[in-house]
C-alpha cells in the first residue's frame, strides 16, 4: 500500500446497517410513525440508494430541505409522502401540486401565503427552542 492510498479519505456506506437501524427504531415505536430526513443528498450518502433502502425497509414519509430535493426524491419514490423544510412560496405552488410535495410552514407569514393554496397539504413547524431552522 502506497503512502498516497493510505492518506486518501474513504467512506463506506453500509446500506444493510441503515435498514437495520430503521427497523430497530421502528420496533421501539407504538402508535407512532417513523420518518426519515434525507436533506443534502441524504447527508452526503447518496439520496437514491438511501431512499430506496429505507423505502424497502418500510419507510414512506421523508423530509428534505428544498423543493429541488423534493422533486428529485419524488422521481425516486413516486408514492412516498415528502415534506419540504424550507416552507411555502406561492411562486412554487405548481411544483408542490405537480409533484405532490408538502411544505413545512415556518412562520405566520408563510401560513397566510399558503392559505389561498391550501388544497395542498402542509405541515407546521413549532419552535420548541432548538433553533434548528
What is the role of each PLM region?
Residues 22:
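Histidine/acidic residue-rich metal-binding segments in metalloenzymes
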Residues 2-5, 9-13, 17-19, 30-133:
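Active-site-proximal beta-alpha core segment in soluble small-molecule metabolic enzymes
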Amino acid at each position: 500500500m502506497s503512502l498516497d492510498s493510505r492518506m486518501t479519505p474513504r467512506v463506506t456506506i453500509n446500506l444493510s446497517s441503515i435498514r437495520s437501524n430503521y427497523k430497530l427504531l421502528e420496533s421501539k415505536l407504538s402508535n407512532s410513525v417513523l420518518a426519515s430526513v434525507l436533506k443534502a443528498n441524504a447527508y452526503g450518502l447518496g439520496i437514491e440508494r438511501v431512499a430506496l433502502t429505507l423505502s424497502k425497509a418500510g419507510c414512506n414519509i421523508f423530509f428534505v430541505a428544498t423543493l429541488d430535493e423534493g422533486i428529485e426524491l419524488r422521481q425516486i419514490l413516486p408514492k412516498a409522502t415528502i415534506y419540504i423544510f424550507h416552507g411555502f412560496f406561492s411562486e412554487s405552488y405548481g411544483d408542490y401540486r405537480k409533484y405532490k410535495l408538502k411544505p413545512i410552514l415556518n412562520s405566520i407569514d408563510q401560513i397566510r401565503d399558503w392559505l389561498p393554496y391550501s388544497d395542498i397539504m402542509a405541515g407546521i413547524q413549532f419552535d420548541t427552542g432548538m433553533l434548528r431552522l
